[in-house]
Amino acid sequence: MAWAQHDLNMPIIQTKYTADPAPYVHGDTVYLYTTHDEDDAEGFKMRDWLLYTSTDMVNWQDHGAVASLRDFKWYKGDNGAWAECVVERNGKWYMYCPIHGHGIGVLVADSPDGPFVDPLGKPLVWQKEHWYDIDPTVFIDDDGQAYMYWGNPNLYCIKLNEDMISTSGDIMQMPHIQDYQEGPWFYKRKGHYYMAFASTCCPEGIGYAMSDSPTGPWTYKGHIMNHTPRTRGNHPGIIDFKGRSYCFGLNYDILRLETSRHAERRSVSAAEMTYRPDGTIVELPYFQDCTLRQVGTFDPFRRVEAETMAWGYGLKTTRENPSGPWNDTPFVTDIDDGEYILVKGVDFKKGAHEFTASCSAQLYGGRIEVRLDSVNGALAGVVNVPNTKFQYQKFTCSLTGAKGVHDLYLVFRGGERQKHNLFNFDWWQMQ
């Protein structure tokens, strides 16, 4: 299904249901960790944590699942991979993972995309008298002291030691912040401490409080995004990136393209946000009514993973290879006639002359139309993908008219004998 409303600020991920955004800036890249609502979820059905990256805030590469419940050997269930938080310290990456009803665990990796391992073999924090230990947010202050906040409906805090996998002192329960429900996001900016959060359910907005101290007292300041019937839940993640500020959250806008019936199949969205001179935040409208401008342009003269896109509704990404072991990286699958990948702001410079795609097909295959600026825009080239017996092969076509900066549409076409599941698509490159 090739449906899109590109003048709306739709969710930034469309190939999976994602929630609980935990963005982290490292160098010139945003690492966006999310939870994962399964495609058949009615209630919360969550088994792993996903990673997406972007250097321009609109084109996102899917890295697949980088951690799952299976990484916690002490947990025997198959559901409960709730809202995570990831931070980097001393060259290590720490993922704090609530496992619903079993506290908050921690995983460690040498790279932001894993592999993540459990250094403790037990929860880092678990208050067994209740089920409030969810939604951790971790921040390292300028003096090196790390703090972890979490909780629904109460807000808790504890200090972390420099090793980031042990705690210091007792758990502190914070006085209730007006409109606080869950999903805290703790950060510091220009001397002010901020506590953003999902505000009282339901529907949840995004509220925030400020403090002069990392442990409060917290003063409620209002909404970053007000409660609205256009969504049900929310969960903030806030960053500064390349001179701009962004608020991530979640909604059900992709689900609503398919059904009006409610289910817990959520989607991460993002919007630019601004601060007043006193540090307070200018309230945002609902995500669809916000803007998300591209920062810079996209380079096509390199290997580009096919699962890098600004829009790809109807497509799916997976690592599961029907002809053998799992791929090291995801690829695009479930490709039907008329669907497409949109990559925004592609800089062809003085001209791209050749397009190469790595694909595999089992039956009749199909073709990729390389179009500029719209799904029916100028046709720059066509790659034909025949039956490859599920083996990946490279296919190349010449290009005409691809110069300067354009939105790139890779439009998938089938023939009379095949309209669905045309082929798998691994990567592409221009020359």
Residue ranges and their predicted role:
Residues 3-431:
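Carbohydrate-active catalytic/glycan-binding domains of CAZyme proteins
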